[in-house]
Protein backbone atom coordinates (compact mmCIF):
# COMPACT_ATOMS: atom_id res chain seq x y z
CA UNK A 1 0.00 0.00 0.00
CA UNK A 2 1.02 3.63 -0.40
CA UNK A 3 1.99 4.10 3.26
CA UNK A 4 4.30 1.08 3.20
CA UNK A 5 5.88 2.25 -0.04
CA UNK A 6 6.45 5.74 1.33
CA UNK A 7 7.99 4.33 4.51
CA UNK A 8 10.43 2.24 2.45
CA UNK A 9 11.65 5.10 0.23
CA UNK A 10 15.31 6.03 0.64
CA UNK A 11 17.46 8.57 -1.22
CA UNK A 12 18.47 5.70 -3.53
CA UNK A 13 14.92 4.73 -4.50
CA UNK A 14 14.31 5.24 -8.22
CA UNK A 15 11.30 3.05 -8.93
CA UNK A 16 8.48 1.05 -7.39
CA UNK A 17 7.38 -2.25 -8.91
CA UNK A 18 3.66 -3.04 -8.89
CA UNK A 19 2.33 -6.48 -9.80
CA UNK A 20 -1.45 -6.39 -10.09
CA UNK A 21 -3.14 -8.77 -10.37
CA UNK A 22 -0.46 -10.53 -8.42
CA UNK A 23 0.56 -14.08 -9.07
CA UNK A 24 0.28 -16.34 -7.11
CA UNK A 25 -1.95 -14.49 -4.60
CA UNK A 26 -4.51 -13.07 -7.01
CA UNK A 27 -4.45 -9.74 -5.17
CA UNK A 28 -5.65 -6.79 -7.25
CA UNK A 29 -4.65 -3.25 -6.31
CA UNK A 30 -7.71 -0.98 -6.38
CA UNK A 31 -7.86 2.19 -8.46
CA UNK A 32 -8.08 4.22 -5.23
CA UNK A 33 -4.91 2.61 -3.84
CA UNK A 34 -3.13 3.10 -7.16
CA UNK A 35 -4.02 6.80 -6.99
CA UNK A 36 -2.48 7.00 -3.50
CA UNK A 37 0.65 5.19 -4.71
CA UNK A 38 0.82 7.57 -7.67
CA UNK A 39 0.78 10.57 -5.34
CA UNK A 40 3.67 9.12 -3.32
CA UNK A 41 5.64 8.46 -6.50
CA UNK A 42 5.00 11.95 -7.85
CA UNK A 43 5.98 13.57 -4.53
CA UNK A 44 9.28 11.66 -4.46
CA UNK A 45 9.93 11.77 -8.24
CA UNK A 46 9.90 7.96 -8.46
CA UNK A 47 9.09 5.85 -11.51
CA UNK A 48 6.64 2.94 -11.48
CA UNK A 49 7.26 -0.36 -13.22
CA UNK A 50 3.82 -1.94 -13.48
CA UNK A 51 3.64 -5.65 -14.29
CA UNK A 52 0.17 -5.95 -15.85
CA UNK A 53 0.56 -9.36 -17.47
CA UNK A 54 -2.59 -10.67 -15.75
CA UNK A 55 -4.74 -7.51 -16.12
CA UNK A 56 -7.59 -9.12 -18.10
CA UNK A 57 -7.97 -11.89 -15.53
CA UNK A 58 -9.90 -10.30 -12.70
CA UNK A 59 -12.81 -11.98 -11.01
CA UNK A 60 -14.31 -9.15 -8.97
CA UNK A 61 -16.91 -6.90 -10.51
CA UNK A 62 -15.63 -3.73 -8.85
CA UNK A 63 -12.76 -2.72 -11.10
CA UNK A 64 -14.64 -0.59 -13.62
CA UNK A 65 -12.07 -0.60 -16.44
CA UNK A 66 -12.75 -2.70 -19.52
CA UNK A 67 -10.87 -4.58 -22.21
CA UNK A 68 -12.34 -3.55 -25.55
CA UNK A 69 -15.48 -2.29 -23.80
CA UNK A 70 -16.39 -5.77 -22.62
CA UNK A 71 -14.88 -7.47 -19.61
CA UNK A 72 -13.51 -5.95 -16.44
CA UNK A 73 -9.74 -5.59 -16.24
CA UNK A 74 -7.47 -4.61 -13.37
CA UNK A 75 -6.91 -0.86 -13.09
CA UNK A 76 -3.57 0.53 -14.27
CA UNK A 77 -1.49 3.14 -12.48
CA UNK A 78 -0.60 4.51 -15.94
CA UNK A 79 -4.21 5.73 -16.18
CA UNK A 80 -3.84 7.93 -13.07
CA UNK A 81 -3.44 11.58 -14.12
CA UNK A 82 0.22 12.56 -14.20
CA UNK A 83 1.53 8.98 -14.25
CA UNK A 84 1.70 8.16 -17.96
CA UNK A 85 5.11 9.85 -18.27
CA UNK A 86 6.61 8.08 -15.26
CA UNK A 87 5.21 4.57 -15.68
CA UNK A 88 6.62 1.57 -17.52
CA UNK A 89 3.90 -1.02 -18.16
CA UNK A 90 5.17 -4.56 -18.73
CA UNK A 91 2.85 -6.73 -20.80
CA UNK A 92 2.93 -10.21 -22.29
CA UNK A 93 0.88 -12.10 -24.83
CA UNK A 94 1.65 -15.36 -23.00
CA UNK A 95 -1.23 -15.23 -20.55
CA UNK A 96 -3.91 -13.22 -22.36
CA UNK A 97 -3.60 -15.11 -25.63
CA UNK A 98 -2.38 -18.51 -24.35
CA UNK A 99 0.93 -18.02 -26.16
CA UNK A 100 3.20 -19.32 -23.39
CA UNK A 101 6.58 -20.33 -24.70
CA UNK A 102 6.38 -17.88 -27.60
CA UNK A 103 8.17 -15.24 -25.51
CA UNK A 104 6.33 -12.20 -26.81
CA UNK A 105 5.99 -9.21 -24.59
CA UNK A 106 6.09 -5.46 -24.79
CA UNK A 107 6.48 -2.28 -22.80
CA UNK A 108 4.26 0.77 -22.76
CA UNK A 109 6.45 3.66 -21.70
CA UNK A 110 7.64 7.13 -22.67
CA UNK A 111 9.59 7.15 -25.94
CA UNK A 112 12.95 7.87 -24.26
CA UNK A 113 12.53 4.77 -22.08
CA UNK A 114 11.62 2.61 -25.07
CA UNK A 115 14.73 3.83 -26.92
CA UNK A 116 17.01 2.91 -24.01
CA UNK A 117 15.40 -0.46 -23.31
CA UNK A 118 15.70 -1.27 -27.00
CA UNK A 119 19.47 -0.82 -26.75
CA UNK A 120 19.64 -3.19 -23.79
CA UNK A 121 17.35 -5.75 -25.42
CA UNK A 122 19.55 -5.84 -28.54
CA UNK A 123 22.51 -6.88 -26.42
CA UNK A 124 20.62 -9.47 -24.38
CA UNK A 125 18.91 -11.46 -27.10
CA UNK A 126 18.21 -11.50 -30.78
CA UNK A 127 14.65 -10.94 -31.81
CA UNK A 128 11.38 -12.77 -31.61
CA UNK A 129 10.95 -14.97 -34.68
CA UNK A 130 8.76 -13.56 -37.43
CA UNK A 131 6.07 -16.24 -37.10
CA UNK A 132 5.60 -15.38 -33.43
CA UNK A 133 5.49 -11.66 -34.26
CA UNK A 134 2.73 -12.18 -36.84
CA UNK A 135 0.83 -14.37 -34.39
CA UNK A 136 1.16 -11.65 -31.75
CA UNK A 137 -0.22 -8.99 -34.10
CA UNK A 138 -3.12 -11.28 -35.00
CA UNK A 139 -3.84 -11.91 -31.31
CA UNK A 140 -3.86 -8.20 -30.46
CA UNK A 141 -5.87 -7.13 -33.52
CA UNK A 142 -8.30 -10.04 -33.58
CA UNK A 143 -11.47 -10.80 -31.62
CA UNK A 144 -11.07 -10.68 -27.85
CA UNK A 145 -14.02 -12.86 -26.81
CA UNK A 146 -11.76 -15.83 -26.05
CA UNK A 147 -10.11 -13.78 -23.28
CA UNK A 148 -13.47 -13.57 -21.48
CA UNK A 149 -13.96 -17.32 -21.95
CA UNK A 150 -10.53 -18.02 -20.46
CA UNK A 151 -11.27 -15.71 -17.52
CA UNK A 152 -14.54 -17.56 -16.84
CA UNK A 153 -12.70 -20.89 -16.95
CA UNK A 154 -10.14 -19.59 -14.44
CA UNK A 155 -12.96 -18.21 -12.27
CA UNK A 156 -14.65 -21.65 -12.23
CA UNK A 157 -11.37 -23.39 -11.35
CA UNK A 158 -10.73 -20.85 -8.61
CA UNK A 159 -14.17 -21.62 -7.17
CA UNK A 160 -13.48 -25.37 -7.17
CA UNK A 161 -10.31 -24.80 -5.15
CA UNK A 162 -12.03 -22.36 -2.77
CA UNK A 163 -14.91 -24.77 -2.20
CA UNK A 164 -12.48 -27.61 -1.58
CA UNK A 165 -10.48 -25.65 0.97
CA UNK A 166 -13.42 -23.92 2.67
CA UNK A 167 -13.94 -26.68 5.23
CA UNK A 168 -10.32 -26.82 6.36
CA UNK A 169 -10.21 -25.37 9.90
CA UNK A 170 -6.46 -24.62 9.82
CA UNK A 171 -6.65 -22.34 6.79
CA UNK A 172 -7.77 -18.74 6.58
CA UNK A 173 -8.74 -18.21 2.96
CA UNK A 174 -8.34 -14.94 1.13
CA UNK A 175 -10.33 -15.10 -2.06
CA UNK A 176 -8.12 -14.18 -5.04
CA UNK A 177 -9.58 -11.36 -7.11
CA UNK A 178 -7.46 -11.97 -10.18
CA UNK A 179 -4.43 -13.57 -11.83
CA UNK A 180 -3.80 -16.76 -13.74
Describe the predicted segments one by one.
Residues 111-116, 130-152, 162-169:
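Amphipathic alpha-helix from the class-I
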Residues 1-64:
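Active-site phosphate-binding strand-loop segment of PLP-dependent enzymes
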Residues 67-69:
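Short Gly/Ser/Thr- and charged-rich N-terminal loops/segments
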Residues 120-129, 170-172:
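Glycine/threonine-rich helix-loop capping motifs at alpha-helix boundaries
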Residues 34, 41, 121, 151, ...:
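Short amphipathic alpha-helical/adjacent loop interface patches that line ligand
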Residues 80-116, 128-131:
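Active-site PLP attachment segment
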Residues 137, 154-162, 173-180:
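Conserved glycine-rich beta-strand-loop-beta hairpin in the small C-terminal domain of fold type I
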Amino acid sequence: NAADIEAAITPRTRAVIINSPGNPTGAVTSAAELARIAEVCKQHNIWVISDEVYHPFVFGETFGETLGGEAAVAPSIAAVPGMKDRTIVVESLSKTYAMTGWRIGYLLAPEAVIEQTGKIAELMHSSVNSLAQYAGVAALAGPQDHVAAMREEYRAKRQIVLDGLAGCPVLRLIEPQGAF
